[in-house]
Amino acid sequence: MWVFGYGSLLWNPGFEPIEQMRADLPGYRRSFCMLSIHHRGTPEDPGLVLALDAAETADVCAGLALRVDEREAEHVLQELRARELISSAYVERWVDLPLADGRRERAVTYVVDRDHAQYCCYGLDQQAEIIARAVGGRGSNSEYLFKTADMLRDLGIPDPQLDYLAKKVANLTKSA
């Protein structure tokens, strides 16, 4: 089984992949378009988490394909579902994923449900303000942003929006 990671699964997959490789998923973009009321915010003060959002243009989301040992596949899938489907804001999708070495593998990933109440479309500056202040059950929203932006840089995956947000949030949290 393969898993496509584009956010926290990059730096905290929750399992030990037996193989990992850069992968680019066409038709989606990485976006802070989901309100987080559990992991990185609360119902009273929601944070924002990344989701795959269907792209209206020819966008591609760059991330990692993480291969799960088949003996662990069912357990890992149950754990992923418990983590990612904590609310119904994500929808599980099995996608045809092009890997960097030319292979194509069927992979599970999690896509935002645009009809869900947690779906949102804020500008970058408003996203930064939310991320700078929100804290949830798994820690601060800024930690989530910084770890994801750092991992993308380490992997050589450019994401100008996350870089902008990381700088903006760092400035906001310094002045707080």
Where does each model-flagged region fall?
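A glycine-rich, hydrophobic/aromatic-adjacent loop/helix-cap motif
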Residues: M1-A176
